[in-house]
């Protein structure tokens, strides 16, 4: 697998070696090799992605646009930079999808292990989320219990000679105000 990624990142290609053939076989360009008119001899897909990303920002902060260039011209330039970035991003995604497909054909057990690992991680994440919610529920149940205890305390006061009158007057409606 590591040898099939050779050339994807700068400095990985052994000196004097030819780039690996593209996914279509010998004679067809791969996603990492230089295609005529598209990439320089030493540029990889990652280099091109980085360059197009930098070009997007450069077009947004360019002094040419600040010095009174037409708004439509600015929009066109930015759109072209963004479109190039998106195209290279799609090519990069395609490269990794092809590598994933090759891996699934060559080593299906590896893909199953990765899927099982992802499912275990998902279960752990959800279990932690459940524990977090249970802790919140416990906290709020405790708050409600404390409130209920506080409301019960006034009725548990020792009964004095005027306690009956105090309870009865608490249940009476408030007097009406004259209009």
Swiss-Prot record:
<keyword id="KW-0010">Activator</keyword>
<dbReference type="Pfam" id="PF11594">
    <property type="entry name" value="Med28"/>
</dbReference>
<dbReference type="InterPro" id="IPR021640">
    <property type="entry name" value="Mediator_Med28"/>
</dbReference>
<feature type="region of interest" description="Disordered">
    <location>
        <begin position="1"/>
        <end position="43"/>
    </location>
</feature>
<comment type="function">
    <text>Component of the Mediator complex, a coactivator involved in the regulated transcription of nearly all RNA polymerase II-dependent genes. Mediator functions as a bridge to convey information from gene-specific regulatory proteins to the basal RNA polymerase II transcription machinery. Mediator is recruited to promoters by direct interactions with regulatory proteins and serves as a scaffold for the assembly of a functional preinitiation complex with RNA polymerase II and the general transcription factors.</text>
</comment>
<keyword id="KW-0175">Coiled coil</keyword>
<keyword id="KW-0804">Transcription</keyword>
<dbReference type="GO" id="GO:0016592">
    <property type="term" value="C:mediator complex"/>
</dbReference>
<keyword id="KW-0539">Nucleus</keyword>
<keyword id="KW-0805">Transcription regulation</keyword>
<comment type="similarity">
    <text>Belongs to the Mediator complex subunit 28 family.</text>
</comment>
<protein>
    <recommendedName>
        <fullName>Mediator of RNA polymerase II transcription subunit 28</fullName>
    </recommendedName>
</protein>
<comment type="subunit">
    <text>Component of the Mediator complex.</text>
</comment>
<feature type="coiled-coil region">
    <location>
        <begin position="109"/>
        <end position="139"/>
    </location>
</feature>
<feature type="compositionally biased region" description="Pro residues">
    <location>
        <begin position="12"/>
        <end position="26"/>
    </location>
</feature>
